[in-house]
Amino acid sequence: MDKYIGKRLDGRYLVDELVGIGGMANVYKATDVSNGRIVAVKILRDEYVQNGELLRRFKNESKAVALLSHPNIVRVYDVNFSDRVNYIVMEYIDGITLKEYIEHKGILDWKEAVYFTVQILRALQHAHDNGIVHRDTKPQNIML
């Protein structure tokens, strides 16, 4: 069992379940016990906490996303950086990834492909307009 499941982060975020595994962090579904809101908590993996470069990238990601406000970009609610655990609390999207959608549906028709592409490009344009380049844009990182 994952060491974070069932635990509270800083007495506020009750970690419910693991929902995603990334290259340097895991994403959990959690409950903000202060208001009952369901959130996503991205926790930097323990093996990377002592890696200065990866920790810097993780911190930069949280700062960058926190500055963005766009309907196609998840909101950041909170961040924590400490010796114990480093995490970003974000809006929870109850859905599937674009990768999962394509695997289930198969080849997209052109109208659907254009629709998704426009939404993705609007989000990326907003990020670029704010000086941010998303370095990991791929179907498994896009929630529907």
Spans of features found by a protein language model:
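Conserved short submotifs of the Hanks-type protein kinase catalytic core
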Residues: 83-97, 101
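Conserved N-lobe loop of protein kinases adjacent to the ATP-binding glycine-rich P-loop
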Residues: 31-38
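AlphaC helix of the eukaryotic protein kinase fold
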Residues: 45-67
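Activation-segment/catalytic-loop signature of the eukaryotic protein kinase fold
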Residues: 79
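Protein kinase glycine-rich loop
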Residues: 16-22, 27
